[in-house]
Amino acid sequence: IGIGECSYLPKLNPEKLDTYESKVAEVCERINEHEFWLDKGLMGFPSIYFGLEIALLDLEKKGSKLLFDSDFSLSEQPIPINGLIWMGSFENMMQQVDEKIEAGFRCIKLKIGAIDFEKELHILKSIRKKSSEIELRVDANGAFPPAEALEKLKRLSEYNLHSIEQPIKQGFPATMNQLCKESPLPIALDEELIGKFTKQSKAETLENINPPYIILKPSLIGGIKGSKQWIELAEERHIKWWITSALESNIGLNVISQFVATTKNTMFQGLGTGKLYTNNIDSPLQVIGDEISYNKQLNWDLSGL
């Protein structure tokens, strides 16, 4: 048996929720047409594509959940990950920061744009007082009004940040391109990649914006195949990238982790979301400190599926 996962995030996934279950049912009923589904049949349904793609990979590997050969899959090489700070009150966010630093994280990512901007700057200043070595990333999720974005980027850059994800909403390539040119803080595209299903549209996005970084979420961009295409196009243009899970369970997280391990990308990846679950599937995946590893001494427990 091969097991996949379709991870749907409302307001992010391009699929429509009211037709989602019926599309999954259609794919299951016509599963023998998987070559069609993996060619053009699921264009516009990236998370369902990802679910089918990994189920077939797992079937090919006899249900072992070992889908890609790498030192990670052999339990020999962990993957460095960032610690994620969720948006909240100043006190709550600082508590999360202290916990991540104490746990040994060398890279911290903060969601910003929800509380007062001055308070968010104060949080960054407080982190920098605690450590000048920690790699700091911020994610605005498109929260900055275009007219204010450059000034905010300039102020953020005072805290020696690694990058900012999606400072303005997606869909304004000319404005984003100008920001990438003028910002003292490197910009990473995230939501901007969603909905680009053809190789041409992906290439045009990178050409028109020319960002320093892109962030890949397989469930939102067409699985492993879609991610590989983005990586190829980005590397041709000397654009760096990293991968982030989209709140998948350990089924999806396992595949994403194993895949990124084959790419030899040494950046901090966004693969620490499994701990957010209260009912996750027990698996060999382990997060110790700021690394995720595959511990072959542990077993998969699929009894709850």
Question: What spans do the regions from the language model cover?
Answer:
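Active-site-adjacent beta->alpha loops and helix N-cap segments on the catalytic face
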Residues: 90-92, 114-128, 144-148, 168-181, ...
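Glycine-enriched alpha-helix->loop->beta-strand junction motifs that scaffold or abut catalytic
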Residues: 102-106, 130-133, 154-162, 178-187, ...
